[in-house]
């Protein structure tokens, strides 16, 4: 084995270790349940089985009045897209899998999603270059 091949192998191992290191201590998410929209939610470390941070905003219409509430939590699955059939409830749910990514329900493409796609693309190019 020549030194170039050994260097490439070490770089590959380092890249894999860096990509895996972030999950060693568990995902961190904000957590609160049914609180007013303006309320701050504390950060928690999720259980190892929880792979998603959930952000849910709910608007309740009761007696011509609107109440806006939010829930932030860790879950093992993404409930986005599950319809609520009550016409007096409007709900928006988003799921993400980066630390503290559920501060708000995104209105467009997530910055973290775009960063993840970019990182994956870049690591693929680096990997092909090394091999």
Curated annotation (Swiss-Prot):
Superkingdom of origin organism: Eukaryota
Gene3D superfamilies (alphabetical): CD59
Cell location: Cell membrane
Pfam family, one: UPAR_LY6
PROSITE patterns found in the cross-reference section: LY6_UPAR (PS00983)
Statement: the UniProt record of this protein carries the keyword ATP-binding: no
Broad class of the protein's primary localization: membrane
Disulfide bonds: 29-53, 32-41, 46-74, 78-95, 96-101
Entry keyword set: Cell membrane, Disulfide bond, Glycoprotein, GPI-anchor, Lipoprotein, Membrane, Signal
Lipid linkage positions (GPI-anchor amidated glycine): 109
Keyword presence, Mitochondrion: no
Annotated signal sequence range: 1-26
Membrane topology: Lipid-anchor; GPI-anchor
Domain UPAR/Ly6 as annotated: residue spans: 27-116
GO cellular component terms attached to this protein's record: cell surface; plasma membrane; side of membrane
InterPro entries: CD59_antigen_CS, LY6_UPA_recep-like, LY6H/LY6L_nAChR_modulators, Snake_toxin-like_sf
Propeptide: 110-131
PANTHER family: LYMPHOCYTE ANTIGEN 6H, LYMPHOCYTE ANTIGEN 6S
Name of the molecule in the record: Lymphocyte antigen 6C2
Source organism of this protein record: Mus musculus (Mouse)
Origin organism lineage: Eukaryota, Metazoa, Chordata, Craniata, Vertebrata
């Amino acid at each position: 084995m020549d030194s170039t091949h050994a260097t490439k192998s070490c770089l590959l191992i380092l890249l894999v270790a860096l990509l895996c290191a972030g999950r060693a201590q568990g995902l961190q998410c904000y957590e609160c349940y049914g609180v007013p929209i303006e309320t701050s939610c504390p950060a928690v470390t999720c259980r190892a089985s929880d792979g998603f941070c959930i952000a849910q905003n709910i608007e309740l219409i009761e007696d011509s009045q609107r109440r806006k509430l939010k829930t932030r939590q860790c879950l093992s699955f993404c409930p986005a897209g599950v319809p609520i059939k009550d016409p007096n409830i409007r709900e928006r749910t988003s799921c993400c899998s980066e630390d503290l990514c559920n501060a708000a329900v995104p209105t467009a493409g997530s910055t973290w999603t775009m960063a993840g796609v970019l990182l994956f693309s870049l690591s693929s190019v680096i990997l092909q270059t090394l091999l």
